[in-house]
From Swiss-Prot:
Annotated stretches, region: Disordered: 37-83, 261-286
Domain text: Shows a remarkable charge distribution with the N-terminus being highly negatively charged, and the cytoplasmic C-terminus positively charged.
Record organism: Canis lupus familiaris
Name the record gives this protein: Translocon-associated protein subunit alpha
Name of the gene this protein is made from: SSR1
Predominant cellular place of this UniProt entry's protein: endoplasmic reticulum
Any further remark recorded for this protein: Seems to bind calcium.
KW Zinc-finger (keyword) present: no
Length: 286
């Protein structure tokens, strides 16, 4: 009889242990609770990520607005939406050093109010930093009123410096204008990096001057030689040859009076010097 109570006690202790080891209803409840808690944690993390993305999206427009405000405060005036501009380089987009570059700027007023075009300017800038000026050209004052739905064309020219040849520079061409309310606008008609071309023709001022100097020097040498030859010819004496009268037929006797001619004919004719010399030589031989 004493053994039976002990067996019952062992059964009572062994049954709960077996239930716990097999994962009974209590164990499945604990596991379900753990899964529920994990799902809630994942959902919370997803919700937090969505909230962060929404905050980022909300911050981006704010940053853009701040950038625009900074540009409005520190930047230059912008172009008017009621105006349109075009540019045309007369000799193409070639920029030879120490040579005239000419272009035309067209302005179109698409609005309902007048625009006053004030000036047109151009400048060369450092390619990596457009705030650094390399060569700033004189602004061309225009002061031209352009009515609505009308167009105007302006001409401008500049000369790139000769030492800039063979290097790239940023070319900025600005058209400055305003409306009747006093609002100032600025349109960057051309804002690109260009390369200045070196002149290869070689016909610069120094070369032309050298050619002219050599031509003048050659002309002086030719004139000097000509004068020297002329002076030598003048120094040589000219030998005069005495020409006698070979016959009386070569002499015009019409101007002599007839009486004088009769007397000359009556008189004995003079012997020529050659005949006398011949007679003398014959007499000496005898």
């Amino acid at each position: 009889m004493r053994v039976l109570p002990r067996l019952l006690l062992l059964l009572l202790l062994a049954f709960p242990a077996a239930v716990l080891l097999r994962g009974g209803p209590g164990g499945s409840l604990v596991a379900a609770q753990d899964l529920t808690e994990d799902e809630e944690t994942v959902e919370d993390s997803i919700i937090e990520d969505e909230d962060d993305e929404a905050e980022v999206e909300e911050d981006e427009p704010t940053d853009l607005a701040e950038d625009k405000e900074e540009e409005d405060v520190s930047g230059e005036p912008e172009a008017s939406p009621s105006a349109d501009t075009t540019i045309l380089f007369v000799k193409g987009e070639d920029f030879p050093a120490n040579n005239i570059v000419k272009f035309l700027v067209g302005f179109t007023n698409k609005g309902t109010e007048d625009f006053i075009v004030e000036s047109l300017d151009a400048s060369f800038r450092y390619p990596q930093d457009y705030q650094f000026y390399i060569q700033n050209f004189t602004a061309l004052p225009l002061n031209t009123v352009v009515p609505p739905q009308r167009q105007a064309t302006f001409e401008y020219s500049f000369i790139p410096a000769e030492p800039m040849g063979g290097r790239p520079f940023g070319l900025v061409i600005n058209l400055n204008y305003k409306d009747l309310n006093g609002n100032v606008f600025q349109d960057a008609v051309f804002n690109q990096t260009v390369t200045i071309i070196e002149r290869e023709d070689g016909l610069d001022g120094e070369t032309i001057f050298m050619y002219m100097f050599l031509a003048g020097l050659g002309l002086l040498v030719v004139v000097g030689l000509h004068q020297l030859l002329e002076s030598r010819k003048r120094k040589r004496p000219i030998q005069k040859v005495e020409m006698g009268t070979s016959s009386q037929n070569d002499v015009d006797m019409s101007w002599i009076p007839q009486e004088t001619l009769n007397q000359i004919n009556k008189a004995s004719p003079r012997r020529l010097p050659r005949k006398r010399a011949q007679k003398r030589s014959v007499g000496s031989d005898e």
